[in-house]
UniProtKB/Swiss-Prot annotation:
Keywords: Cell inner membrane, Cell membrane, Membrane, Protein transport, Transmembrane, Transmembrane helix, Transport. The keyword Membrane applies. It is a single-pass membrane protein. Belongs to the GSP M family. The gene is yghD. GO terms for biological process: protein secretion by the type II secretion system. It comes from the Bacteria. The keyword DNA damage does not apply. It comes from Escherichia coli (strain K12). Residues 61-178 are periplasmic. In many other E.coli strains this gene is part of a type II secretion system, but in MG1655 the locus is missing a number of genes. One of its GO terms (cellular component) is plasma membrane. Pfam families: T2SSM. This is Putative type II secretion system M-type protein YghD. Residues 1-39 are cytoplasmic.
Amino acid sequence: MLRDKFIHYFQQWRERQLSRGEHWLAQHLAGRSPREKGMLLAAVVFLFSVGYYVLIWQPLSERIEQQETILQQLVAMNTRLKNAAPDIIAARKSATTTPAQVSRVISDSASAHSVVIRRIADRGENIQVWIEPVVFNDLLKWLNALDEKYALRVTQIDVSAAEKPGMVNVQRLEFGRG
C-alpha cells in the first residue's frame, strides 16, 4: 500500500516535470522559424556529440591503449623470463661441477663472510666442511650466499651455542648440489 502510494506520487511528479519541460521547450521554439529550429537541433546534436567524445570516448580510448601497451610489455617480459629460466638454472648448476671447484667456491666465499674454515673433505656427492666458531648471523649470510649464487645447499648441519653470546659451534656441515 505504501509502495503503491509512492509509485503514484512519483508518476505525478514525473508528469509535472515533463509537462514543464514541454512547456518550456514549446515556449522557446514557438516564435522561431523552421530554419532556426533546425539550426538549434543541429547545434544541440553537435554539442552532445562533442561532449560525448571529449568526456567519455576519448578518455576511454586512451586508457584502453595504455592498458594494451602495458599488457604487451608484460607478455614480452613473461616470454623473455620463460626463455631465460632454463639457461639461468643450467648456469647455476654448472657453475661449480668438480669437487675442486666446489671446494674453491666454499673457501673463497667463507673468507668473504668472516667464516674460518679448518678443513674441507670430499664425501662422494657432498662436501663436508669443518669451521671455527662463528657469529650466527655471519653463518646464515654465508650459507644463503652459497645457496643463491652457487646452488650449494646444506644437506646436514649440527650447530650448538658457543660460550660467547651470538657465537655458534658447527660440529658438522655438509653441502650438496641443489
